[in-house]
Amino acid sequence: MVRKTDVKVVEGLRGGNGTVELHHIVSKEELNGHGTMYAHVIIKPHSSIGLHQHVGNTEPYYIIKGRGVFVDNDGSRIDVGPGDCCIIEVGQSHAMENNTDEDLEMIALVYNE
C-alpha cells in the first residue's frame, strides 16, 4: 500500500502558541495498539507545543531541520537542532519551542509502555 500522509494543522497544541503541522506517517490504527502517533511534526516559526505529561507512553523526538528549545521534565531548557533526539519517558512532562524565523521539523513516535 502507498498513500499520502494525513495532515492536521493545530493552533495552540497542548496549550502552546501558534501553529503546528502534524503529518501522520501511519495512523493510530496502523500502530496496532502499540502506540498513538508516528508523525513528521513541523512547528512553525515562533510557535510551540505546550507543556504536557506522558501517561502510559514514551515519546522520542528526532530533530531533522531547524532549531528549537526542548523543555525537559525538570524544567531545564535545552537548545536542540538537527540530529538531536529528545526522549520523554513514561510519566514525564515536556514542551518544545520554536523561537526562530524558520520551521522546526522533527519525527515523533508515541509508543505505549
Question: What is each stretch, according to the model?
Answer:
Residues 45-47, 56-57, 76, 92-93, ...:
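A generic "binding-loop/recognition-motif" signal
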Residues 51, 70-71, 88, 94-101:
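Short beta-strand His + acidic residue motifs that chelate non-heme Fe in jelly-roll/DSBH
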Residues 40-41, 60, 87, 101-113:
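A short hydrophobic beta-strand segment most commonly corresponding to one strand
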